[in-house]
Structures are given as structure tokens and as C-alpha cells.
């Protein structure tokens, strides 16, 4: 079977966790390759809801291996908490089911303090960070002064690095008008204990995955956030601190580009965004509030209400291009049931001209207004439907129009929250 990358094709929160959970049955290994616990995957299986922030969604499938790659930044407190919660639910019965990279960087208390202090200092220019220390941790990684999982396994090395890095953090926080209250010896003992808790899962992930491929195992790479939040290709600076696009899947786990055979982009049937930044199709009216309520658009990590709007075909086409998408899975199609008309942005109006591609400058995007194409809505409930032909004609027409505008096939539609409430037209693991 091929190896498949799943990435968000919008601004995150597209429902990647559900699709990964569905596709895991066809894979042997699920790999997380970037981001941290600023991402939240909400899974509903048999009516039971599980929210994961670090461990890949596939962990709910017995017999599947889940990998956290070197490109992920890990809050060890969160990782241990998720392990304990999963075990309490009867999942993760085999410790060999979870593999954690020794080279993944660690989120420390000062990263969170710096994250919050900076956001407060920015005033109206806030980016909308979750305050979980993701950005400062990636900064330390690039500056070559970060701590990695392997550092937690050597208490003497950990103590030395904590002393050095905490001093730098105090200086930065002082400049921001904040303080770092830290008992360094206690912190070292706590993080050494966390290191012992995760030591049984920690290994060289590159070697582990290479051997899995040699054994003929298939991989499912699970992205976090979305294309429009990529640090290089998103609406900078209103982005996350890592590369969220498909090209980073192999970089974030120690494999080469030939390991990827298929790239699946996940897009809602409408759109949402959390935090600041340009969002041309945003609806600040009753329709936007209706989408928010029907779609349950509140962050799995922060609980913040998401900004909502109609589907943006320009943004989706951009995601197709920068990820090299092979296909799209459309989620929350059921949320659009009951709307008299549904709209798709097919262009942007700017200074009297109509653009058919998304500008690369976010300040220019801010000045754009959407040009909409309207399609008739449908009233039929979709949750019980399981095949493409079962969908109401108007719902099928909507999906087909999105497919035409995006330039790639819509290979699946989610029609409800539960894993089983999905119509799979083409299985990426069986595609030729």
C-alpha cells in the first residue's frame, strides 16, 4: 500500500483528526511531523468523544503504531497526561504502540511565559497565539539552544541546560516587563521524572520508520493546523511557527521525499479561522453565527469561538498548489443542510479588478472583498447517508463545483461527527 500525507487545506480545524482516524485502518503506522499541543483533534467513536493534542489520532486503533516525529515540539506534561488518559480508557494497552523521537524539542515553562508576555505586549497587533509556548520553543530550536527529549533522560545534562536557558529567559521576560518564578532544582527533578515516564517510548524515529518501510509497512502522516498557517506559505505573520504543508511531512520524521505517494487535503464545506489575520470570506452576521452554532466551531484546544465564513476557492486552489494535493476530503458537509443558498468565493475584488488567485501579501488580502458564486441549498439530513449516490442532487452539485474550482477530485465527504458518518468515494490507500 502507498504512504499517505494528510494536511489541512485551510486555516486549521478542518477535521483532519476524523479523516486520519478513518484512514488508520488501512495504514500500519501514523506519524505526527510538526506542531505541538496548540493543535487539537476531536474524535467521536461510538458516540464517545476523545480530544488529543499531541498523540496521533490513530492511537484509538488497536495494533497500530503512532509516531511523534522530530519536527514536533512536546510539552512532556501534556504527553504524559494524554498517555495516562488513554490508558484509563483502555487504549494504548501496548507501550510499543507509541514511539517518540529523541530529537523532538521540549516546551519548557519559560517558553509559555515568554509566549504570553509577548502577546500581551503586542496590544492590538496580537497574532492570536494559544500561549502554549510553541513559537518560543521553535525559536530556541532554530537558535540551537533548545532542549530535546534526549536531554530529559540525562539529569546532569538537563540541570546544566536548564540553568543556561532559564537565565536567558529571565532577561527576555524582564525586557517585556514580566518575571519568571522558577525553582530550578525542583524543575530539573520534575522534568527528569517526566523523562523517565516517556523513556520507554523514546527512540531514533528515522531508523524506526526506515525499518518499518523495509518491512513493507504503510505510513499515514498526520499534519496539524493548516496550509494558510504555514510559517512560509501562510498569511505571515498570522501563522504558526512550523511548516504545515505536505513537504514537511518527511523532514519532520527523518525520511526522504520518495516516502510519500499520495497527499490528501482536508477542507470544510465552508471555512473557519482562529486568531487574527486576513480572512476575505468571513461572515460577521447571522449567517456566520449560524455556521458557528451548527458546526460547533469552538477550538478543541482553547475553546475560543472560531471565525466563520463561506468556502474560499482561491485559498483552496492555493493549498492544492503548495501541497501538491492528490485529492480533497470535504468535512462538515452536513452543516450546510438547511441553507437556502450556499456560496463559494470564486474571486477577489481589489481596486476595481477581479483576481482569480490569492495574493501573496496578507495586507493586500485584507483589502480584498470576495466575489461569490451562489448555488441552491438543500434541506435533506445527511448523517445517515453512506454513498455518493445517496447524497441529495444539490449537495452533489455543490461538491462537484468545489472540485472543478480546486482542480482536484473530492475523494470523500464527512456527513457527521462520528467516524462512520463518512462517504469515501476514493480510498487514498487504494488509489492508483
Curated annotation (Swiss-Prot):
Q: Which organism is it from?
A: Anaeromyxobacter sp. (strain K)
Example GO BP: IMP metabolic process
Q: Lineage of this protein's species?
A: Bacteria, Pseudomonadati, Myxococcota, Myxococcia, Myxococcales
* Principal localisation: cytoplasm
Catalytic-site annotation from UniProt: 13 (proton acceptor), 41 (proton donor)
Q: Where does Mg(2+) bind?
A: 13, 40
What's the protein name?
Adenylosuccinate synthetase
Enumerate the NCBIfam families for this protein.
PRK01117.1, purA
Catalyses: IMP + L-aspartate + GTP = N(6)-(1,2-dicarboxyethyl)-AMP + GDP + phosphate + 2 H(+)
Oligomeric form and interacting partners: Homodimer.
Query: What GO molecular function annotations does the UniProt record carry, in alphabetical order?
Result: adenylosuccinate synthase activity; GTP binding; magnesium ion binding
